[in-house]
């Protein structure tokens, strides 16, 4: 980012500046962060980053707020069900800091559309998407463009937020998603990747959601993403993915301040 927004943010972020200092706050104010996936993890990443003074966001997600998001996603309320997550998050960000610039992309990131995103303009990338295909493509693009990236590993089917850790992907253990990511990244020659993962053994869901979900809260006929058609819907609680999101945001802030 090129503009200097630090002075305008002084009063709102004065307590943060007491810890980070003015130079760091200026860096944050002039940083552009792309958050891929505005869900249980990504929503809290955005929340903490805007409250920390980040000056520009790119929000990428094709989903709309669903009734089943109410148990854990910071953007989910009865009033926002049915609306695009990116649009709701943008409104929330601007309510917190109207001086922030927010760019929204109502689409799902895939290798096929990777070139549509201005990676060279990002100062940091947060991977909070669910699918391995998208995560791998995102990491590869970030490495190609030499943009710092941090990836969220599995936060579903877990109950203990205290077991999240920050590590290189090749030093992770227990997490099934991290295991797959290690294998796929090794094939592609990726030597390192900062991730947030949990060492908690995943809890087996008490019910088969793929069979029992019949709410059809906003899933219209023919929709690409329908709860009733997903093979495996993980269990979730409010106090786990939120922790992962806040840890990720902390890493982003610290890295941007050191840059």
Protein language model annotation of sequence segments:
Residues 128-129, 152:
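Short, well-ordered coil/turn residues at beta-beta hairpins
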Residues 106-114:
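Conserved SAM/SAH-binding loop
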Residues 35-37, 60:
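Conserved N-terminal Rossmann-fold NAD(P)-binding element of oxidoreductases
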Residues 54, 59-97:
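Glycine-rich phosphate-binding loop and adjoining beta1-alpha1-beta2 segment
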């Amino acid at each position: 980012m090129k503009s200097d927004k630090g002075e305008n943010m002084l009063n709102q972020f004065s307590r943060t500046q007491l810890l980070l200092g003015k130079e760091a706050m200026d860096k944050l104010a002039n940083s552009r962060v792309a958050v891929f996936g505005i869900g249980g993890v990504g929503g809290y990443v955005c929340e903490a980053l805007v409250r920390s003074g980040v000056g520009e966001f790119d929000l990428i997600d094709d989903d709309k707020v669903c009734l089943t998001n109410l148990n854990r996603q910071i953007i989910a309320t009865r009033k926002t069900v049915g609306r695009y997550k990116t649009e709701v998050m943008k409104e929330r960000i601007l309510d917190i800091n109207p001086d922030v610039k927010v760019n929204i992309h109502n689409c799902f990131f895939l290798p096929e559309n990777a070139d549509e995103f201005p990676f060279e303009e990002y100062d940091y990338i947060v991977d909070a998407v669910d699918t391995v295909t998208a995560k791998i493509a995102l990491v590869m693009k970030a490495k190609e463009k030499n943009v710092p990236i941090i990836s969220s590993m599995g936060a579903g089917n877990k109950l203990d937020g205290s077991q999240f850790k920050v590590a290189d992907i090749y030093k992770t253990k227990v997490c099934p998603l991290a295991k797959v990511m290690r294998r796929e990244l090794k094939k592609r020659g990726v030597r390192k990747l900062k991730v947030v993962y949990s060492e908690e053994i995943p809890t087996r869901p008490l019910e088969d959601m793929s069979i029992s979900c019949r709410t059809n809260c906003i899933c219209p006929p023919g929709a690409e993403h329908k709860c009733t058609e997903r093979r495996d819907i993980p269990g979730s609680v409010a106090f786990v993915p939120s922790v992962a999101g806040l840890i990720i945001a902390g890493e982003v802030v610290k890295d941007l301040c050191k840059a």
